[in-house]
Amino acid sequence: MPLAFSDISCCDSYESPVERIVAELNIGESQNIKLSNGDIVHLTLLEITDIRDSLRNAVRAANIKISVDGEEISLNSGNYNLPVTVGKVQIDCPVFKNYYINAPYDVAWELLKDARFRVWPKGSSYIKPGSFVYPIKQAWFAGKSQSGNEPAYVNTAEYPLSNKLYYHSFHDIGGTEGMDEIVSATEGLVISANNEILDGYDSISTHVGWIDIKSPDAVYIIDNRGWLAGYLHLNSIDPAIKPGVKVRMGQKIGNIGMQGSAGGWVHLHFLLCTKDFSSGRWVAEDAYAYLWESYIRQFKPHLMAVARPHQLVWTGQEVILDGRKSVSLAGDIISCKWTFTDGTTAEGAIQKKIYSKPGEYSEILKVTDSIGNVDYDFSVIQVYDREHPENPVPSMHAAYYPTINIR
């Protein structure tokens, strides 16, 4: 049976459960999963293989073989991958057990078996239309980001002499200090804001992993699904946002900042958790698919270029740049062009590159579709000197404002 991940709300009432059903499996285990539309799908977890780097032994990708109603497919995990359609379902794998090997910050996952899967009916929304908006007034991928268990890397957070990994289970969106406006992704009840907690909710901090919801730079809201959304590192919080207040979807929360444990770079740390009904603890919910879908609904882009996640390599080591996660919503992608920091260019979604000098590189991907739409993204490559791994590489988070409605 699928795990009992609750949609129970701490508010007076709650909406119908979202489309996705969560299930955990061990290798070799099979389950019949009842979808939100009543259909039954048979899942069997066959094999898990991770792909790790040679510097920190960090998980960078995965090959998770699963049978869906007898059809075998391979899934990646997190790292800017959207759910995959197979048979009558859409399915993804937000986390698997191999992350625990060298990750001290593991409590947010609350993983009980070898891998966790989310399953939606084929063609359904990832999250109920009209119940979730993009939480920042900013263009998609305008700056650096950390998402889907990507190892934290901004401001030299990746260091080859340290194998203590912080896999970023929530979603960071980089921006410009005090400028980008943060809005509530959902309707809901403010349970914590500006270092104050609503009476009766003090115990939540002990059930949200290592996160303390009492913070001067953060706002926490429980929505009508019973999900917990957190907005952290804020430069300022709107005076109307106070514990006990019910907020509207899209209502201003505050402005982006680098306060608290931001690590020295300006970003929104967007936290999304659901409650595990069996343990009472809050579990990290990978928000990438919901952010992707809500951004498309609001801003209606024709093309979405994706060059992420970042990579960490030694000098002289080959890097594979991959733009195949890019999606055209209006036509077919006909061109992927890379522009490299050494001034060279290359055509094709997949490119190989070797760096002889240590440093941080930002390689630009330009994607064009058959309608003539163009979109850009960039891939950050951090390169360390193999002979002197103790030397940190310089890092910079470049940001600009505004990022939308530019003429």
Show where each model-derived region lies.
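A residue-level detector for short acidic-glycine micro-motifs
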Residues: 47-49, 175, 192, 233-236, ...
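Extracytoplasmic
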Residues: 28, 40, 59-61, 112, ...
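Surface-exposed, glycine-biased beta-strand/turn segments
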Residues: 116-217, 249, 258, 262, ...
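Surface-exposed, beta-sheet-biased, low-hydrophobicity segments with strongly acidic/polar composition
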Residues: 5-140
